């Protein structure tokens, strides 16, 4: 299957500048292509993954991805999809974010491919251009009329847009031109909101290098959930690739909780499973939706891809322990992951009677209620029912001297962190 055919089967193509020309090009040779990300934060979230998963598919097909980190454009701010100006970041913050995103990209792309990935930072060539060169060599090739007509600018004319953000499309066009002349990059991939920026780059290349230049643009559709909301958010906010921001367990849970109506679409977008395997899973969603096999496969594939085999196995173990109630099998680190979003309480390591301890923490409203719940078998500590109101809570009850898990009823878990 041609790489373009595969992208279209996966529903991953929104717009192309010249479909026939691009098809012919990728059939004739292995091309270089690029996609960029600005370092507005120190981690990507799963929404950022969408165009880069397409880059990965090109890599697996033997093409040559160039990943651009916007060390220069990140100091300016992309107006795409924004209703207001971005807050400018210091150069120190931008550099910190550049380093973090570079590490994430290398982890995702430096394995499993049939070709190497090149990482570039547009600060390296942009900072050498002075204002006179910018205006004479590049600005002269942009019509104010055409710039104003771009959706990313037109949508901001009523609320206002600074000259800084207005010129962003010129800077991105300069990136494409630089990569075309220095790295033989012929294709730029981006989200649907990048169409205007991408076509600006194509126009600049043809003006500077001649209309015979073979350059192309391709955008990815905006991914919406079946309920019409934007993909990439959980109840707790964005789902990050950084395990310190979103633990591998939380990451796994996001995917395993995918709606039946969305799971096949996500399998096509985000995994490298074959059409035959995805069709097989689609049948199982229709026939045996209660087994949630497609969701489990999606969660496994994505957790392995972003966090690795070990993190996936750990997330699966935590999930099984929470489902069965057998939390004693977990380590303290696994407890911290699995119970991160649970109600959390602080306690000293001092030995206390269970009734007083539950009331002092606020898990129980009164001693009478605490005793009643214990006598009714409604209180469990670290997976074991507490049957005696005279039980003492000691540091020996904890996971590695750090945590105690209380369950009240069938599903109400609380995480107790032990201090000094």
From Swiss-Prot:
Residue ranges of every copy of the S4 RNA-binding domain listed in the record: 352-418
Cellular component aspect of the GO annotation: cytosol
SUPFAM superfamilies: Alpha-L RNA-binding motif, Nucleotidylyl transferase
Keywords (A to Z) from UniProt: Aminoacyl-tRNA synthetase, ATP-binding, Cytoplasm, Ligase, Nucleotide-binding, Protein biosynthesis, RNA-binding
Binding site for L-tyrosine: 34, 168, 172
Entry annotated with the keyword Membrane: no
Gene Ontology BP annotations: tRNA aminoacylation; tyrosyl-tRNA aminoacylation
Binding site residues for ATP: 233
Record-linked InterPro entries: aa-tRNA-synth_I_CS, aa-tRNA-synth_Ic, Rossmann-like_a/b/a_fold, S4_RNA-bd, S4_RNA-bd_sf, SYY-like_C, Tyr-tRNA-ligase, Tyr-tRNA-ligase_bac-type
Reaction(s) this enzyme catalyzes, per UniProt: tRNA(Tyr) + L-tyrosine + ATP = L-tyrosyl-tRNA(Tyr) + AMP + diphosphate + H(+)
Motif placement: 'HIGH' region: 39-48
Subcellular location: Cytoplasm
SMART domains found in the cross-reference section: S4
Main location: cytoplasm
Family to which this protein belongs: Belongs to the class-I aminoacyl-tRNA synthetase family. TyrS type 1 subfamily.
Protein task: Catalyzes the attachment of tyrosine to tRNA(Tyr) in a two-step reaction: tyrosine is first activated by ATP to form Tyr-AMP and then transferred to the acceptor end of tRNA(Tyr).
The protein's name in its UniProt record: Tyrosine--tRNA ligase 2
Lineage: Bacteria, Bacillati, Bacillota, Bacilli, Bacillales
């Amino acid at each position: 299957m041609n790489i373009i055919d595969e992208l279209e089967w996966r529903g991953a193509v929104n717009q192309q500048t010249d479909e026939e020309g691009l098809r012919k090009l990728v059939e004739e040779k292995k091309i270089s292509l690029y996609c960029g990300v600005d370092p507005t934060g120190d981690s990507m979230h799963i929404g950022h993954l969408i165009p880069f998963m397409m880059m990965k598919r090109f890599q697996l097909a033997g093409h040559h991805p160039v990943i651009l980190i916007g060390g220069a454009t990140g100091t300016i701010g992309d107006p795409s999809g924004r209703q207001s100006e971005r807050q400018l970041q210091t150069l120190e913050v931008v550099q910190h974010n550049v380093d973090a995103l570079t590490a994430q990209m290398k982890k995702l792309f430096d394995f499993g491919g049939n070709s190497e990935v090149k990482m570039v930072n547009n600060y390296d060539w942009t900072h050498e251009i002075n204002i006179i060169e910018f205006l004479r060599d590049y600005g002269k090739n942009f019509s104010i009329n055409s710039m104003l007509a771009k959706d990313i600018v037109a949508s901001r004319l009523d609320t206002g847009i600074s000259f800084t953000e207005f010129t962003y499309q010129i800077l991105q066009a300069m990136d494409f031109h630089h990569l075309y002349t220095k790295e033989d990059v012929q294709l730029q991939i981006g989200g649907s909101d990048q169409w205007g920026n991408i076509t600006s780059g194509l126009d600049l290349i043809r003006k500077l290098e001649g209309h015979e230049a073979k350059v192309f643009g391709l955008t990815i559709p905006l991914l919406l959930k079946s309920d019409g909301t934007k993909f990439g958010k959980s109840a707790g906010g964005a789902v990050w690739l950084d395990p310190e921001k979103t633990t591998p367990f939380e990451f796994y849970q996001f995917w395993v909780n995918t709606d039946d109506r969305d799971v096949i679409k996500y399998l096509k977008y985000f995994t490298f499973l074959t059409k035959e395997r995805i069709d097989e899973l689609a049948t199982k969603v229709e026939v045996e939706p209660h087994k949630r096999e497609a969701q489990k496969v999606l969660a496994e594939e994505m957790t392995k891809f972003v966090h690795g085999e070990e993190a996936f196995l750990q997330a699966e173990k935590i999930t099984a322990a929470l489902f069965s109630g057998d939390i004693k099998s977990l380590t303290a680190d696994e407890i911290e992951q699995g119970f991160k979003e649970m109600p959390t309480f602080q306690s000293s390591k001092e030995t206390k009677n269970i009734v007083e301890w539950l009331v002092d923490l606020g898990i129980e409203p009164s001693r009478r209620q605490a005793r009643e719940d214990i006598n009714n078998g409604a209180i469990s500590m670290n997976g074991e029912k507490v049957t005696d109101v005279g039980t003492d809570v000691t540091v020996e009850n904890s996971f590695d001297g750090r945590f105690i898990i209380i369950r009240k009823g069938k599903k109400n878990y609380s995480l107790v962190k032990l201090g000094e």
